[in-house]
Amino acid sequence: MAGPSFDLEIAHPLPLAGVDEAGRGPLAGPVVAAAVILDRGRVPAGIDDSKKLGAEARADLCGKIREVAHVGVGIATVEEIDEINILWASMLAMERAVAALGVEPAMVLVDGNRCPRWTRPSQWVIGGDALCLSIAAASIVAKEERDRMMADYDVHHPGYGWAKNKGYGTPAHLDALARLGPSPLHRRSFAPVAQFSLFPAA
C-alpha cells in the first residue's frame, strides 16, 4: 500500500500545515500536538504514519523534518486534560502547535474527525497520518516530543516505567499504580487512575 503523499494537499493554498497529536490514550502525562509546514521541494524520504515506524527511524526522521520544515509543538497539561477532558485538551494542544509555527498557514489539515474551534481555514482528515505527508510529519514530531517528555518524567517519578510504556495502561503500569498510587502526572479523570486517587503519591 502506498504511503502518505501530497495528493490530498495540492488542492489547498500554501503555506499548508499538517497537524496531529500524540498521547490521547495514556493514563499519565500531557497530550502533545505538532504542526508541520513542509517545503515540497525538500521532503525527507521515508515519512510515514508514526505508528508504522520503528523508534530509530522515527527519531531520525524527526530530526530531518525539523531541519527543513516549519515546526510548532503544543502541549495540554494533565491539569487541563482533567479539567476540560482529553478531546478538548487535544484540540487545545493543536491550537498551540499551530500558534507556535512562527508562520501563519493559509490552510490546516488536521488528523481525525474534527478541527479545533478556531477561525483559520482547516479541514479534518480521517486517517490523515497515513494519507497526507504534512500530517504524517506532524505525527512523527508529536510522538517523538511526547516520548522524550515521558522519559524525562520517568527520571523524576520512578517506578511507573514511563520511559518504556509512555504512560499507557500496561499491566506493569497498572500494577505500579496500585502499589504506589497516582503521581502528580497521572490523569485523575481517567477511570483506572480515579480508583486510586484517594491515595495520592507523594
From Swiss-Prot:
CDD domains, per database record: RNase_HII_bacteria_HII_like
Pfam families per record: RNase_HII
Catalysed reactions, semicolon-separated: Endonucleolytic cleavage to 5'-phosphomonoester
Family annotation (PROSITE patterns): RNASE_H_2
Reported cofactor(s): Mn(2+); Mg(2+)
InterPro entries cross-referenced by the UniProt entry: RNase_HII, RNase_HII/HIII, RNase_HII/HIII_dom, RNaseH-like_sf, RNaseH_sf
GO process annotations (BP): DNA replication, removal of RNA primer; mismatch repair
Domain RNase H type-2: 14-202
Binding-site positions, a divalent metal cation: D20, E21, D111
An MF annotation (GO) of this entry: RNA-DNA hybrid ribonuclease activity
Compartments reported by the entry: Cytoplasm
Cofactor: binding comment: Manganese or magnesium. Binds 1 divalent metal ion per monomer in the absence of substrate. May bind a second metal ion after substrate binding.
Keywords: Cytoplasm, Endonuclease, Hydrolase, Manganese, Metal-binding, Nuclease
Listed GO CC annotations: cytoplasm; ribonuclease H2 complex
UniProt EC number: 3.1.26.4
UniProt main location, coarse: cytoplasm
Job of this protein: Endonuclease that specifically degrades the RNA of RNA-DNA hybrids.
Family: Belongs to the RNase HII family.
Descriptive protein name: Ribonuclease HII
Gene from which the chain derives: rnhB
